[in-house]
Design a protein with these regions (language model features):
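Alpha-helical transmembrane segments of multipass membrane proteins
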Residues: 18-23, 85, 89, 140, ...
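Interfacial loop-to-transmembrane junctions
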Residues: 211-234
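Transmembrane helix-loop-helix
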Residues: 92-104
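Residue-level signature of transmembrane alpha-helical entry/exit and packing/kink sites
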Residues: 4-12, 78, 82, 101, ...
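Membrane-proximal soluble regions of multi-pass membrane proteins
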Residues: 20-77
Length: 251
């Protein structure tokens, strides 16, 4: 029991460390800043953060959510992204155990988390994230090569439909980044799970979009990336169980 608890603690710590790097990507990629050489600093006073200011999650709590020098508030995004990434890693390892699949899905979830925040703010999905997920799909497919046809169909079945929709509406109904996202995630998940993920993402997005319009009383541009990503994450964790329940219920 104790070794298992220690393992999950290590996994969570690893998750929040990667989550800290995701915050760097979320902040710098839209601004086209260098993600390697640029020093982390306070957005208010420019104070260059020391290593002890950058300990994921714990530094934020120790500083009370404020800059060490100017005492300006630090965005709550930083601890939320770190903690959420850690929790997602725990869920993946709880579901898939110590396996290549767990490693691939953890990296997938991190990419989805970062691109979701960027897309929500900028309405663009940086192409690098889709290329990264494509690489994960190829690696995953190499370990599950007997299912290559499922993955190939998954790559095409949703993305081709969305591509037609994209050109038919001049990009007003769906973004090009969303088309690519569904293609590369389909390569990773296979056709059954990507269809489930797409439909679920559309439902989640529609409901939240309607709530936002109802509350604000005005229209909003819908960034689909976060909702499609949520659909993919749910499909990875519970999609097969849902599909099995659905088939048993109706057949």
């Amino acid at each position: 029991m104790l070794p298992t608890i220690l393992l999950y603690i290590v996994i969570f710590l690893y998750g929040i460390v990667i989550g800290s790097f995701l915050n760097v990507l979320i902040h710098r990629i839209p601004k086209k800043e260098n993600i390697v050489t640029t020093r982390s600093h306070c957005m208010n006073c420019g104070y260059q953060l020391r290593w002890y200011d950058l300990v994921p999650l714990f530094s934020y709590l120790a500083l009370g959510g404020r800059c060490r020098k100017c005492k300006a508030h630090i965005s709550v995004q930083y601890p939320v992204i770190e903690a959420l990434n850690g929790v997602l890693y725990l869920l993946v390892f709880w579901k898939y155990g110590m396996s290549v699949d767990s490693l691939v899905y953890c990296l997938l979830f991190s990419a989805l988390l970062a691109l979701s925040v960027i897309d929500f703010r900028t309405y663009e999905i940086p192409v690098g994230f889709n290329l990264f997920i494509l690489a994960l799909g190829l690696i995953h497919g190499a370990f599950h090569y007997t299912q290559w046809l499922d993955f190939l169909i998954g790559f095409l079945c949703v993305s081709v439909f969305l591509l037609i929709l994209y050109y038919a509406t001049g990009g007003r109904a769906i973004g090009g980044g969303d088309v690519k996202l569904m293609a590369v995630c389909g390569l990773l998940l296979g056709w059954e799970l990507i269809i489930f993920a797409f439909l679920l993402g559309c439902i989640i997005g529609s409901v939240i979009h309607l709530i936002r319009m109802k509350v604000s009383g005005e229209g909003h541009v819908l960034a689909m990336g976060p909702y499609l990503s949520a659909g993919v994450a749910i499909a990875v964790l519970w999609g097969n169980e849902f599909l099995q329940w659905y088939l048993n219920f109706y057949l």
